[in-house]
Amino acid sequence: MHVTLVHVKVKPERVEDFIAATRANHEGSVREPGNRRFDVLQDPADPSRFLLYEVYASEADATAHKQTAHYLAWRDAVAEMMAEPRQGVPWRGLFPED
């Protein structure tokens, strides 16, 4: 199992735009064959901070995700919304086992 935690800081005035764009990416991502989970979390103390919790069956599936039309559209759409660069941190999932 391949897990990536993506830390996102959005310009405060673009939060709603980011949520809309990210919903479309989420909806496409959860349909990918290797996707196991794709959660989008918002910090209640700072609504401009988000965490994307992405779980794929393998590293190859996670890499393939970045070539999908929905991901590429999302990446381009949110580029100008970022208050700082996104930080993706890979993790190895232990439990639950696949």
Features from the language model and the residues they span:
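Short, well-ordered beta-strand segments in beta-rich or mixed alpha/beta enzyme
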Residues: 2-9, 39-66
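Short, surface-exposed ligand-recognition loops at beta-strand->loop->(often short) alpha-helix junctions
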Residues: 9-15
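Short phosphate-engaging motifs
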Residues: 14, 48, 70
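Short, flexible segments with low predicted structural confidence
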Residues: 1-2, 16-17, 33-35
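An amphipathic, aromatic/His-enriched active-site/gating alpha helix that lines ligand/cofactor pockets
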Residues: 20, 24-36, 55-89
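Glycine-rich beta-strand-turn "strand-cap" elements at beta-sheet edges
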Residues: 2, 40-48, 76-98
